[in-house]
Amino acid sequence: LNFARSIDPIFQQEVTITRQAVANERDIEKGQTMGKKQIVPYALYLAEGYVSAHLAQKTTGFSEDDLELFWEGLINMFEHDHSASRGKLSARKLVVFKHGTALGCCQSHLLFDKVRVERTSGDMPPRSFGDYHVTVDRDIPAGVEVLEKL
């Protein structure tokens, strides 16, 4: 899995937070502590990745069951680990290009270019997934199947 990149520039904000619970002895008299938190109001990231069927067959033993477990993990990775530091992170779409042969039927970059993400909110900053339109061009080479897992 490659590093994800934001679709649009992101703008971090800094907010001040007050903690009512005392975290150390020197703050006992104050009864609270102040802190700062960096947030990004909204961002949509695109990540791309690869599974080498050839290596799985010859070296790693990575199976179809392992792959299905991986897809399930990607889809649900933030569902059972909510945190204020991550806000409402969630997977929104999972497009898989499945090749008919272990060495592939098409170069990956050509397939990744088939997934397009466009802003629909005009000049306003995006604030939700609804501010984007995701399309998948289904005109793909023979031997490749498009699967939308999410």
What are these regions (language model features)?
Residues 2-150:
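Basic polyanion-binding and macromolecular-assembly surfaces
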